[in-house]
């Protein structure tokens, strides 16, 4: 599972997720990408499950890039513990994902195999996703901004 080797601080505040992803919102390495359509936290276990789903479907062909990294620690206090006594210990790590973020990329396989592999990976993730090609990514950013402004 993915987690940072070392961090400056052990614990982090929750924060708020709003707006679109302006970084990592285009297919940079592969031919096909899996784009998040809504904001969420994605745990390292979910990232690993999605990665396994992709590699299992494409077998030995193709190359997979994971474009998100779980660098936010989530703390949890033990069960049946009274309030207070400080912040709990780190339980797991998550990646903060905003709408428009490319989470996985795939290259070296046919289009139908890539779409099915990324669709299977999307089923393992807690966000609505869309499979995009390198060619259609230019129009996606403008579509995303237009749809969010109308709501």
Swiss-Prot record:
The name this protein goes by in its record: Large ribosomal subunit protein uL16
GO biological process: translation
Pfam families in UniProt: Ribosomal_L16 (PF00252)
Cystine pairs: none
Gene from which this protein is expressed: rplP
Record-stated family: Belongs to the universal ribosomal protein uL16 family.
Organism: Chloroflexus aggregans (strain MD-66 / DSM 9485)
GO MF entry, a single one: tRNA binding
One GO cellular component term: cytosolic large ribosomal subunit
Leader sequence residues: none
Keywords of the record: Ribonucleoprotein, Ribosomal protein, RNA-binding, rRNA-binding, tRNA-binding
Domain of life: Bacteria
Species classification: Bacteria, Bacillati, Chloroflexota, Chloroflexia, Chloroflexales
Subunit structure of this chain's protein: Part of the 50S ribosomal subunit.
Function summary: Binds 23S rRNA and is also seen to make contacts with the A and possibly P site tRNAs.
């Amino acid at each position: 599972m993915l987690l940072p080797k070392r961090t400056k601080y052990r614990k982090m505040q929750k924060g708020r997720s709003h707006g679109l992803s302006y970084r990592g919102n285009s297919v940079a390495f592969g031919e096909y990408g899996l784009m998040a359509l809504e904001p969420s936290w994605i745990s390292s276990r979910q990232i690993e499950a999605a990665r396994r789903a992709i590699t299992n479907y494409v077998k030995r062909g193709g190359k997979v890039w994971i474009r998100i990294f779980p660098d936010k620690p989530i703390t949890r206090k033990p069960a049946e513990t009274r309030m207070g006594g400080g912040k709990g210990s780190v339980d797991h790590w998550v990646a903060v994902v905003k709408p428009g973020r490319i989470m996985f990329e795939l290259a070296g396989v046919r289009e139908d195999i890539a779409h099915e592999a990324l669709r299977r990976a999307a089923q393992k993730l807690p966000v609505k996703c869309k499979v995009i090609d390198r060619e259609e990514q230019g129009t996606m950013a403008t579509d995303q901004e237009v749809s969010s402004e109308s709501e």
